[in-house]
Amino acid sequence: PVVPAREQNVPPEIRPALPSQPGSSEKSPQQPPSRVDRLAPPPDEHSLLTTAVRRLRTAHDPMSALAALDDYRVRFPSGGLAPEAGMLRAEALLQIGRKGDALAELDRLSLGQMPNSDERYVLRGELRAGVGRWREALADFDVVLRGHAGQSAEIGAPTDAKAHGRLERALWGRALARSRLGDDAGARADLQECLRRFPRGRFAPEAARLLGEHR
């Protein structure tokens, strides 16, 4: 293969959209619940997930956060915030080095229906590549790169540094996956594109070396 196996672990930026709790008025006549009201999570669900976020992001205690998420899963197995809880669980598991369990969480989620889906697809692709699931990894990287296929070469210098990093990781990851699947021409094309768009990027030296070896 053109590209040697290597694994990257770049934790996702996960920001669950926790809805605020609705207020009430004693004098207001009762009205039938709106569709939004019916879909809003109950206060206990909201509070429990907020506790998990605080433990994970503020207290930097992933084990305690996992305990809150375990409680959430038992009490609200089909809760309105279950996808956000799954992403938080994956983040906590990555922080304690349990990559396989984190990947299992990501495998269960419909990433395309969640905010910040590009980051999550790239992360899952990297984790899948890390355990040799090359074809599935390729599919994840393809989702991200197809979404930016119409952009010009200036994509290598976007104002959003995180978007810059995601696209570079997706290109490198797809080159790796294509190489492992026997598509050396596709891998070379991705390495060339990686150098063209990100000439001073984190993978540029290795991409240049590999292209030089396979001329």
Language-model region placement:
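Low-complexity, Pro/Ser/Thr
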Residues: P1-G86, E91, Q95-R98, R108-L111, ...
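Alpha-solenoid repeat scaffolds
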Residues: G79, Q113-N116, Q151, H164, ...
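TPR/TPR-like (Sel1-like) alpha-helical repeat modules
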Residues: L145-R146, D184-R202, G212
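Short, low-complexity, Pro/Ser/Thr/Gly-rich segments in the mature regions of secreted, periplasmic
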Residues: E206-H214
